[in-house]
Amino acid sequence: LDPEHASAHHHRALLLLFLGDYESGFSAYEWRWRDPAHLARQPSLTSSPWRGELMRDATLLIYPEQGFGDTIQFIRFLPRVAERVWKVIFWCSGPLVPLLRQAPGVDLLWEGESPSPEFQIHAPLMSLPTLLRQTRDRIPGVSGYLPEFAWEKPSRDRSSFLPLRVGLVWRGRSTHRNDCNRSLDLAWFEPLLNLDFLPWVSLQEGAEREIVEHSRWRERMECPDLTDFAVTARVI
């Protein structure tokens, strides 16, 4: 037995979160930093870590540490963070930038490869529930956590589609270590894709989009040009 086994504590945290014990689960989730693989994602920063205290004269840098989906889910906590510090800088890059440019609680969206130099404290995004001491009944954004930003207009007119339209994502990032349990071949959805009354929308880009465009389902599945997550949100 190893009471300090980081991976065991990490999986225990996930189980607690699954059971709805958010306070204990998020607290236990801090064990992820004992995992060398996860620790490698932590940027080299010389500022002090923020502990959730009131610091009205300090600028806080918040950095994402995991995937796009985790970032989108956890930005809901930024307005509450903004109530405790003078200024919030969110370090972000890539296709999420257009989506988060007007996110509530963010004073500056930093897009550089290295962190902005103008901050005194820092915190990882996924630690915010613990730092804010969130319980299940205090989680913000339960009815929608992405306000209406300045969405890009969709590339095609959607008026010709029926009221019920189904967006489909069938593959994740191939480099993910659990990709074998997260991704499927499009052919698995054949019984549903063959239903004439059901219009589909592909929410995939890259090679998966090309697969649809060269498949027999092309006529019944719209493939909008999803250049970034703001466009995707607008399509949804």
Model-derived segments and their meaning:
Residues L1-I236:
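Alpha-helical solenoid repeat scaffolds of the TPR/TPR-like class and their adjacent stem/linker regions
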